[in-house]
């Protein structure tokens, strides 16, 4: 009976040790993957198209504003046959950014009063 109990404890210990090593390997792989994604994002961020500039070459290259990414909007100018695409911020997102800025400012005042 003691032998079975000792064998069971040994088996559980080995199993937990091997699963911990596997989790460490997965965590390391996740960290490496996350770092590579961050590096790609930084490289991509350097090539973004500023607001009101032509984005017809790459419609997903618009820069980010404080909270939201600008959108490549295409239209035909009056009396023209050529399509023009520029990076623009939709009005509803512009208003949301203004509201968030005012809320942040108001929150700072409340923190100053009570903090």
UniProtKB/Swiss-Prot annotation:
Disulphide bridges, residue numbers: 48-63, 55-72, 62-87, 74-85
Propeptide span(s): 21-44
Keywords: Disulfide bond, Knottin, Secreted, Signal, Toxin
A Pfam family it matches: Toxin_35
Family assignment from sequence similarity: Belongs to the neurotoxin 19 (CSTX) family. 01 subfamily.
Domain of life: Eukaryota
Official protein name in the record: U3-lycotoxin-Ls1k
Subcellular location: Secreted
Keyword Ion transport attributed: no
Primary location recorded for the protein, binned into one broad class: secreted
Domain observations: The presence of a 'disulfide through disulfide knot' structurally defines this protein as a knottin.
Known tissue expression: Expressed by the venom gland.
Signal peptide range: 1-20
Species this protein is from: Lycosa singoriensis
GO cellular component: extracellular region
InterPro entries: Spider_toxin_CSTX_knottin, Spider_toxin_CSTX_Knottin_CS
One function term, GO molecular function aspect: toxin activity
């Amino acid at each position: 009976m003691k032998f079975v109990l000792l064998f069971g404890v040994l088996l559980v210990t080995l199993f937990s040790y091997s699963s911990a090593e596997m989790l460490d390997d997965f965590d390391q792989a996740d960290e490496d993957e996350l770092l590579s994604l961050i590096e790609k994002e930084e490289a991509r961020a350097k090539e973004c198209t500023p607001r009101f500039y032509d984005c017809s070459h790459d419609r997903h290259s618009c820069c980010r504003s404080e909270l939201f990414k600008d959108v490549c909007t295409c239209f035909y100018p009056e009396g023209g046959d050529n399509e023009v695409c520029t990076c623009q911020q939709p009005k509803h997102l512009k208003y949301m950014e203004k509201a968030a800025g005012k809320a942040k400012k108001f929150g700072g005042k409340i923190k100053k009063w009570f903090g």
